[in-house]
């Protein structure tokens, strides 16, 4: 990707690295900014604490990149949302400065649960699924004759007691 982007100087890269710490055992995260230093002036990295530290809903994140763009983004953000509450800021600070043992433990647990889910979905003849990596959710492909995803989720809940969220929510 970096080789192609070098030929297109008008293109910027926005690298969403929210799943940086939720890796399979033995895998290593590679930040786009680190592997493509020639594109550093056109690369912006978005990250946060929602996934890696289970702080979903606390709305603590960060953006790194070229100073002028970051300043403009900060000005825009400051006029469109309120500040992050103090307990979430303290939680984020503790996450940055503390041990990552809990993150490793959570990643193992998420991966285990995802594997159970994937195995169960693979056992349903009508569904096809690509085994997900780097995340804790799955997106099975429904047959063409199936109802749309939202209706499918309603049927799953009503008929078999399975609560699932349709992919369109994401």
Segments predicted by a language model, with ranges:
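PLP-dependent class I/II
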Residues: 1-170
């Amino acid at each position: 990707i970096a080789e192609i982007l070098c030929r297109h100087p008008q293109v910027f890269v926005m690298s969403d690295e929210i799943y940086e710490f939720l890796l399979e055992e033995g895998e290593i995260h590679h930040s786009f900014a680190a592997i493509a230093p020639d594109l550093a002036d056109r690369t912006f990295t978005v990250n946060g604490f929602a996934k890696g530290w289970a702080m979903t809903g606390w709305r603590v994140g960060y953006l790194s990149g070229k100073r002028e763009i970051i300043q403009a983004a900060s000005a825009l953000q400051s006029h469109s949302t309120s500040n992050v509450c103090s307990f979430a800021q303290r939680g984020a600070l503790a996450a940055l400065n503390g041990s990552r043992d809990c993150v490793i433990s959570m990643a193992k647990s998420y991966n285990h649960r995802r594997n159970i889910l994937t195995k169960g979905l693979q056992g349903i003849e009508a569904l096809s699924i690509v085994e997900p990596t780097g995340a804790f959710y799955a997106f099975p492909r429904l047959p063409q004759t199936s109802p749309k995803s939202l209706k499918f989720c309603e049927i799953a809940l009503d008929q078999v007691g399975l609560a699932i969220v349709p992919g369109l929510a994401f």
